[in-house]
């Protein structure tokens, strides 16, 4: 992502600054001197113009009119433009009046040309108007009977035995339209075929049935925030108000309503925060409940704005604030109750014979003879009466053995002779054979001078490879 740099604003010109700050009297000296023409260069020209006549060159601090001759335009030349002139109209000649003719127009003296208009009608009689009425007793009858004709009605019924919709079977209906009667009857025997259906899904409730007609095909899980990464500063908050009033740790304002499960944004954080750990915080994200080392932890992520660039970019660290609510108690252990009473110290043998179990208590004794000792084992007995019921029970399957130890005769083990066998010792230059008479013997001294070789033992693998 390429960072966009903020566009620099153009500074105001000298004339704009002079027009705004002159009335208030806060103009800098260089602005006033440049606009009013009192700079050092202007003063040098004024002093030099007292003794030097520059004529009409227009050099100096005058009004800028170009002197007496004015400015001479640069460039010039070229053909002059052609001016279009319209043709002249001929003059209108007006006849002159003679001085002997009067200039007064006489009025029309003959009034016979005036017409008075149409004459006014005259009415005779004083009885007024006569009103006559007429009544008719015969009603108006409109003949709307159609002309006589023959109407032929034909119908076609096609039955499909593979598909018959039950709601389409309705009761017979009749209709009357201008002396034409239509009566439709539906009757007949409809056969059907029974097809064995298989149940693909049972009605056993597993607790995971969808609650909508189009359930979501997959379960979308939100990745848990990595609160303990190296990019976050871990800060522990011991004040329990951090759960219900987190904004009081950043600003001194007391809002009327503060949501708990939403993110909080601070437009202008205070220069001095109520809690030093929350200095320069501009955003506190929504909380999260996690379990950490056997505790229930309330966490919020915070964003600081320690630095601000000219482009408006805010730079700051990310902090993880957490508060331990309580510890998670260990799971309750259920106390198991014995199936049998403590008085009857019997064990149940799962391999006991059913015929022997019906006789009551069986106490067989099996003795195995051994040399110099005897071991006897007593098999456990079985109680056939167990009618008590318990909520939490245990079934002991272990058996106990009674092993009596008896003393036997002493066993004498063979011992080695206490005197070492005699081996004749001769000089080295004489060759003699070595006679072994006992468990210990001397090797021929010449064998010590021979080179010792490593004994190679071959190893055979299952694939037939021999390794040395």
Swiss-Prot record:
Q: One biological-process term from Gene Ontology?
A: viral penetration into host nucleus
Renumbered to this chain, the signal peptide range is: none
* One Gene Ontology term of the molecular function aspect: DNA binding
Disulfide connectivity? 21-27
Q: How is it modified after translation?
A: Highly phosphorylated.
Q: Which InterPro entries match?
A: Late_L2
Bilayer-spanning residue ranges: none
> Where in the cell?
Virion; Host nucleus; Host early endosome; Host Golgi apparatus
Say which domain of life the source belongs to: Viruses
Record keywords: Capsid protein, Cytoplasmic inwards viral transport, Disulfide bond, DNA-binding, Host endosome, Host Golgi apparatus, Host nucleus, Host-virus interaction, Late protein, Microtubular inwards viral transport, Phosphoprotein, Viral penetration into host nucleus, Virion, Virus entry into host cell
Ranges spanned by the short sequence motif Nuclear localization signal, renumbered to the chain: 1-12, 449-457
What's a GO cellular component annotated to this UniProt protein? Answer: host cell Golgi apparatus
Oligomeric form and interacting partners: Interacts with major capsid protein L1. Interacts with E2; this interaction inhibits E2 transcriptional activity but not the DNA replication function E2. Interacts with host GADD45GIP1. Interacts with host HSPA8; this interaction is required for L2 nuclear translocation. Interacts with host importins KPNB2 and KPNB3. Forms a complex with importin alpha2-beta1 heterodimers via interaction with the importin alpha2 adapter. Interacts with host DYNLT1; this interaction is essential for virus intracellular transport during entry.
Q: So what family is this one in?
A: Belongs to the papillomaviridae L2 protein family.
Q: What does this protein do?
A: Minor protein of the capsid that localizes along the inner surface of the virion, within the central cavities beneath the L1 pentamers. Plays a role in capsid stabilization through interaction with the major capsid protein L1. Once the virion enters the host cell, L2 escorts the genomic DNA into the nucleus by promoting escape from the endosomal compartments and traffic through the host Golgi network.
Give the protein name, as stated in the record.
Minor capsid protein L2
